């Protein structure tokens, strides 16, 4: 009997699918759960971006946690600044009745300070709202109130701009850049102080006044960062050995910061080693014009646009990526839609949910 022959090539199932280098950077959207391949990729990412050691004396601070801390501090400082401005305007408005009373007193003069009739009795000054003021001081307040009103407004505006150019008052963290001064002038995080690692080798006065103020202070921390944890880990270890207990290192440095929050936190142009590489397998390679690197600004506070960018990237990082969380999010979304459809005919938009998530980020206390 002749042996039965199988249909098709037996090596068809073991044949590997040829890979196109053009689409190697595109990842699958189907998440099959935990696997050895994903675990190896995660380990490679950790080795590429982080430098963990078993005997680390310092504590680490994630980039996302630092961004949340920045948003909370900036929003709280802006609220207190608005409250103080409102109080100043209220105090300025409270002086208007006194100026009206002064105008009534000057109505009895001929414009040169000489009274038309009998001089006012001392009883008027006692019963007046400005008790204890003499006739001369009342006229002086009137003169200063007419001509110097615009000057006072300009001084308030200058004070507001000067307050925005200074660091945040009572900031819970002190951010130190341990790179060289040239690298700091090229690019740094907003609100960071330049503190090169060579300062630790000084025999006399190795620390600045701000570092001594924040050292082991209650409710305050010191954060060190660099490009890729090489210098920051050495500086953090040395400072912890010298008695700093509230010291943290920004995990990943500017390299991970450029990946997680590429806009809003940094002023100046990032170094080439920290820039995110473009995907290699592109359909058409377009020539990218080279932009000259810009110098970092002397910037101590975040603008409203910077805070919006930081919140946007924080929302992108907090979105769940695994299948189970997506399924749970979808089921909870369907349940919430059903309940809202019963209660109200209109469904909430995604913008409302984003605003809720942003407010929840701001309401979280920093740790």
Swiss-Prot record:
PROSITE patterns: RHODANESE_3. InterPro entries: CEP41, Rhodanese-like_dom, Rhodanese-like_dom_sf. Disulfide bonds: none annotated. Residues 89-121, 319-367 are annotated as: Disordered. Residues 107-116, 338-367 have a biased composition (Polar residues). It is found in: Cytoplasm, Cytoskeleton, Microtubule organizing center, Centrosome; Cell projection, Cilium; Cytoplasm, Cytoskeleton, Cilium basal body. Residues 169-266 form the Rhodanese domain. Pfam families: Rhodanese. It comes from the Eukaryota. Gene3D superfamilies: Rhodanese-like domain. One of its GO terms (biological process) is cilium assembly. GO terms for cellular component: centriole; centrosome; ciliary basal body; cilium; cytoplasm. Keywords: Cell projection, Ciliopathy, Cilium, Cilium biogenesis/degradation, Cytoplasm, Cytoskeleton, Protein transport, Transport. Its main location: cytoplasm. Required during ciliogenesis for tubulin glutamylation in cilium. Probably acts by participating in the transport of tubulin polyglutamylases between the basal body and the cilium. Belongs to the CEP41 family. This is Centrosomal protein of 41 kDa.
